[in-house]
From Swiss-Prot:
Protein name: Transcription factor MYB32
GO cellular component: nucleus
Domain of life: Eukaryota
Keywords: DNA-binding, Nucleus, Repeat, Transcription, Transcription regulation
Induction comment: By light, UV, cold, drought, ethylene, jasmonic acid (JA), salicylic acid (SA), abscisic acid (ABA), cadmium (CdCl(2)), high salt (NaCl), and cytokinins.
Residue span of region Disordered: 123-144
Species assigned in the record: Arabidopsis thaliana (Mouse-ear cress)
DNA-binding region: 37-61, 89-112
SUPFAM superfamilies the UniProt entry points to: Homeodomain-like (SSF46689)
Cellular localization per UniProt: Nucleus
Entries under InterPro entries matching the protein: Homeodomain-like_sf, Myb_dom, Myb_TF_plants, SANT/Myb
Domain HTH myb-type: 9-61, 62-116
C-alpha cells in the first residue's frame, strides 16, 4: 500500500501564491517551526499542498536567503564543487548558505557554463577542450591501431596515401588497390609426361621430323644420338610419311615419366620371347 495523499486535490489551490498566503505561512513557521509539512497546511489554514508549502518556504520565504547576484567567490566555489560532485545540486547548495539548489542550477546553465567555454574549458570534464579532443583521438587510435592485433583480409586492401604540398599544406587521401600476391598453386592431379618433354616433342613435330631411339639408347647403352642399329624405331623419318601405332610411340619416344633414363634398368617390353 502506498502513502496516503497529504491533501485533497479537489480543495487545494494551484498557481501563484498570494501575499496573504505568504503571511500565513511565515507567521505559522515563526510560531511553531517547520514541523511536518504534510500536516502544516491544515494547521496554518492554507488550502495548499504540503510540498508546495515546503518549496515556497525554502526557495522564497526563509529569512536566511541571499538576494542578488552571485559573487566571484561563489562562482569559484560552484566550479570546484561541480568538478567534484557533478550535477548534484542539492549537495552543492548545502555548501553555499543562503542559496537554493534550483537557483544554483539555473545560474550554472546561464552564466558559469558560458564562462568556462569562453576560457576554453570543457564544463563537463573541467579540462581544456583541446586536451579532451586529443585524448579522445589518441584513445580511438589506440583502439584501432593496436600492435598486438593483426587484421587478416582475403580481398583487396585499401591503402591511404597522404600527399602534402610545399607551398600550401594540402592533404589528399587517395585509395589505391593493393593486389595481394598469392601463390599460384595447381592442385590438378593427372598422369602425364612432364611438360618439358611435351614442348620438345611439339617442337620436333612442328619442324616435320621426329627422332626415335631404341631402348638401349634411351637407357644409356647407345651413343645417345641417332642409333646405328638396324632397328626401325631408331630411324629418322618424316612425320608426314611415317605411320606408326600408339604402342610404338609409347615405347619409342623418350619420355622420362618415372626417371628411368638415369638408371641402368632394362626395358623388358622390347625383349623378344623365345
Amino acid at each position: 500500500m502506498g502513502r496516503s495523499p497529504c491533501c485533497e486535490k479537489d480543495h487545494t489551490n494551484k498557481g501563484a501564491w498570494t501575499k496573504e498566503e505568504d503571511d500565513k505561512l511565515i507567521s505559522y513557521i515563526k510560531a511553531h517551526g517547520e514541523g511536518c509539512w504534510r500536516s502544516l497546511p491544515r494547521s496554518a489554514g492554507l488550502q495548499r499542498c504540503g510540498k508546495s508549502c515546503r518549496l515556497r518556504w525554502i526557495n522564497y520565504l526563509r529569512p536566511d536567503l541571499k538576494r542578488g547576484n552571485f559573487t566571484l567567490e561563489e562562482d569559484d566555489l560552484i566550479i570546484k564543487l561541480h568538478s567534484l560532485l557533478g550535477n548534484k545540486w542539492s549537495l552543492i547548495a548545502t555548501r553555499l548558505p543562503g542559496r537554493t539548489d534550483n537557483e544554483i542550477k539555473n545560474y550554472w546553465n546561464t552564466h558559469v557554463k558560458r564562462k568556462l567555454l569562453r576560457k576554453g574549458i570543457d564544463p563537463a570534464t573541467h579540462r581544456p577542450i583541446n586536451e579532451t579532443k586529443t585524448s579522445q583521438d589518441s584513445s580511438d587510435s589506440s583502439k584501432t591501431e593496436d600492435p598486438l592485433v593483426k587484421i587478416l583480409s582475403f580481398g583487396p586492401q585499401l591503402e591511404k596515401i597522404a600527399n602534402f604540398g610545399d607551398e600550401r599544406i594540402q592533404k589528399r587521401v587517395e585509395y589505391s588497390v593493393v593486389e595481394e600476391r598469392c601463390l599460384d598453386l595447381n592442385l590438378e592431379l593427372r598422369i602425364s609426361p612432364p611438360w618439358q618433354d611435351k614442348l620438345h616433342d611439339e617442337r620436333n613435330l612442328r619442324f616435320g621430323r621426329v627422332k626415335y631411339r631404341c631402348s638401349a639408347c634411351r637407357f644409356g647403352f647407345g651413343n645417345g644420338k641417332e642409333c646405328s642399329c638396324n632397328n626401325v624405331k631408331c630411324q629418322t623419318e618424316d612425320s608426314s610419311s611415317s605411320s606408326y601405332s600408339s604402342t610404338d610411340i609409347s615405347s619409342s619416344i623418350g619420355y622420362d615419366f618415372l626417371g628411368l633414363n638415369n638408371t641402368r634398368v632394362l626395358d623388358f617390353s622390347t625383349l623378344e620371347m623365345k
